[in-house]
Amino acid sequence: FNKLNLPLIIIGDGPERLKLENISNSNIKFLKRISDRKVEEYMSRCKAFVYAGIEDFGIAPVEAMASGAPVIAYGKGGILDTVNCLNEQNNEKVKNGLLFKKQTSQDIFDTISWFEDKKLWKKFKPENLHEYSLKFSIEKFINKIDFSINKAWDKFNKKI
């Protein structure tokens, strides 16, 4: 974001924060710990949520979509279960973000530059992003677990 000269807000704290603050330009703002409500407020106002990590299932990108923000993320790990990339190959899918292929600053730069140059944020409708995020709600999770348990129980009972 130093090269992009676009505003970036980093929320949270960690061992690298001071180092990052020291090498960041004035377009980058750091917020330590803020309330969940404030996080939602920031997400609802941003052009995109950038997520460069790898997790089995990252909840933060889903929370960003719930707030109406598209996701720009590294295309590995659990993010592939939640983000459908905006491109020509998947016109049938709900598009809710962009994926970069390599976990490098250059790939992030290129993807965000494309997002900005083509004004891609205009292609994402906050209400569609929110609706898609509901696939990952607690209620849906409980229903799927309940269904799986009942199915296993029925299978077990048939063997007895």
PLM region descriptions:
Residues 1-22:
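Conserved catalytic-core segment of nucleotide-activated headgroup transferases in glycan assembly
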Residues 18-37:
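Nucleotide-activated donor-binding/catalytic signature segment of Leloir-type glycosyltransferases, i.e.
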Residues 41-46, 145:
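Short alpha-helical donor nucleotide-sugar binding micro-motif in glycosyltransferases
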Residues 44-56, 69:
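Acidic donor-binding loop of glycosyltransferase active sites
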Residues 58-62, 79:
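Short glycine/serine-rich donor-binding loops of glycosyltransferases
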Residues 70-73, 80-83:
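Short hydrophobic beta-strand element within catalytic cores of glycosyltransferases
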Residues 84-105, 113-120:
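Conserved acidic donor-binding segment of nucleotide-sugar-dependent glycosyltransferases
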Residues 103, 119-160:
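A charged, aromatic-enriched C-terminal amphipathic alpha-helix characteristic of glycosyltransferases
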